[in-house]
Amino acid sequence: CTLAADLLKVPVHVMKKVRIDGRTVETTSGQVNVKGSTAVILDDIISTGGTIATAANILRDGGAERVFAACTHGLFIEDAANRLRVCDDILSSDTLEGVYTRFSVAPAIADAL
């Protein structure tokens, strides 16, 4: 996340996630001042969407006007689509094709080879 923020020359805020069990996650954010801004949440995997929805609600409560989420691997199981309605848009790579697929990892893999 900090690399992306550095490349884009934008501020970064890291939220801490602690997994209590297979279905329960506790998210802490500290002070979030995003009033009037566009926020982007980055995560490696979105499964049920619970963590992203919690983070998006924290950002909305902090005054973010728009909230986007992006991930590498989008599973989007159970009621994820409903939970993620708090976000303005969701972007996922093509590692798992789906309704939120917006970008390909193929160029990065080809470059690495």
Placement of each model-derived feature along the sequence:
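PRPP-associated nucleotide enzymes
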Residues: C1-L113
